[in-house]
Swiss-Prot record, chain B:
InterPro entries per UniProt: Longin-like_dom_sf (IPR011012), TRAPPC (IPR007233)
Function: May play a role in vesicular transport from endoplasmic reticulum to Golgi.
GO biological process: COPII vesicle coating; endoplasmic reticulum to Golgi vesicle-mediated transport; vesicle coating; vesicle tethering
Alphabetical UniProt keywords: Endoplasmic reticulum, ER-Golgi transport, Golgi apparatus, Transport
Entry's localization field: Golgi apparatus, cis-Golgi network; Endoplasmic reticulum
Native source organism of the sequence: Mus musculus (Mouse)
Record bears the keyword Cell membrane: no
Protein family according to the UniProt entry: Belongs to the TRAPP small subunits family. BET5 subfamily.
Protein name: Trafficking protein particle complex subunit 1
Length: 202, 145
């Protein structure tokens, strides 16, 4: 896990000293945002989720700029998704995504069978209800990285059984300028139109 | 050879976890009382052993044995105490107790954001992994004397 702490003469990349540093930091971010709200009517949980997603989005934007320096320009949706599954996931979690599927209409399902942020919680239903808040940051991360690569997206996560992150559904990837021209109502309808279709393995 | 039971205490004497496998005789007192007695005895013996030692001690108190069982003790720098009772045929198991701490307690309790530290461990994953690990040990057996 450990590695060079600075880029050397041969251009080694920066590496995180230990993945556990990020895990503990993420844990504390979630704990801080989920602290009991003195005003129960303020929509605290939804707000906390969006704050975590926002943090992830900003980190994803930065990683999107930082990581693909050695790769060619990402023009195709599939290249962008492969970048997420391999490069981004390796940078964040020292592993690759376990699966990538699509319905060829803009909806993609990314599958991680042992998502590192969920592994310590177990493999049964004990903490299943608590899982979504530990996925919000990563949803934002994917969204931010795609934004940097020029794709507008909507990312949602679901967990059917721990520690598998069953699907990180990346909905309706379009080049950024096209989406801005369409506007959000179209984006939503495109996503919902894509949901019912068969999703095939790539 | 056999494993009887295992206690996990924090630095404040809270029993974080208790498991038993081949325990034929109970103490006859409530479990909470048993934990307090065990922790108090360990606290005293550890203090006594270090004070009476004729040489500088590296690891301190490691184990004691009676005519029927052997108590193995491992303490981490953070004050977590792992205590395992076995029969007399089991040799030093410091590496086993260290594994329980580092590969099970740290991985499935400390790293689990939903397990508050300093309280009894509720994680089913920790319990099941600990049980599997202890049952896989070469000296785990029901043939207790």
């Amino acid at each position: 896990m450990g590695g060079k702490c600075w880029p050397g003469a041969r251009g080694e990349r920066w590496r995180m000293a230990d993945a556990v540093l990020f895990e503990f930091l993420h844990t504390e971010m979630v704990a801080e945002l989920w602290a009991p709200d003195p005003d129960p009517g303020s929509g605290g949980k939804k707000k906390s989720l969006s704050v975590l997603e926002g943090l992830g989005f900003r980190v994803g934007q930065a990683l999107g700029e930082r990581l693909p320096r050695e790769t060619l320009a990402v023009r195709e949706e599939l290249d962008a998704l492969k970048f997420l599954c391999k490069d981004l996931w390796a940078a964040m979690f020292q592993k690759h995504m376990d699966g990538l599927r699509t319905n060829h209409q803009g909806t993609y399902v990314l599958q991680d069978n042992s998502f590192p942020l969920l592994i310590p919680m177990g493999s049964g239903p004990q903490y299943l209800e608590e899982a979504p808040k530990f996925l919000a940051f990563t949803c934002g991360l994917l969204c931010g990285a795609l934004h940097t690569l020029g794709f507008q997206s909507l990312v949602t996560a679901s967990v059917a059984s721990l520690p598998a992150c069953k699907s990180l559904g990346v909905g309706c990837l379009l080049p950024l300028n096209v989406v801005q021209a369409l506007g959000h109502p179209h984006l939503w309808s495109l996503i919902s139109a894509g949901k019912g279709n068969q999703i095939n393995k790539l | 050879m056999t494993v009887h039971n295992l206690y996990l205490f924090d630095r404040n004497g809270v029993c974080l976890h208790y498991s038993e496998w081949h325990r034929k005789k109970q103490a006859g007192i409530p479990k909470e009382e048993e934990y307090k007695l065990m922790y108090g005895m360990l606290f005293s013996i550890r203090s006594f052993v270090s004070k009476m030692s004729p040489l500088d001690m590296k690891d301190g108190f490691l184990s004691f044995q009676t005519s029927r069982y052997k108590l193995h003790y491992y303490e981490t720098p953070t004050g977590i105490k792992v205590v395992m009772n076995t029969d007399l045929g089991v040799g030093p198991i410091r590496d086993v107790l260290h594994h329980i701490y580092s590969a099970l307690y740290v991985e499935f309790v400390v790293k689990n954001p939903l397990c508050p530290l300093g309280q009894t461990v509720q994680s089913e994953l920790f319990r099941s992994r600990l049980d599997s690990y202890v049952r896989s040990l070469p000296f785990f057996s029901a043939r207790a004397g």
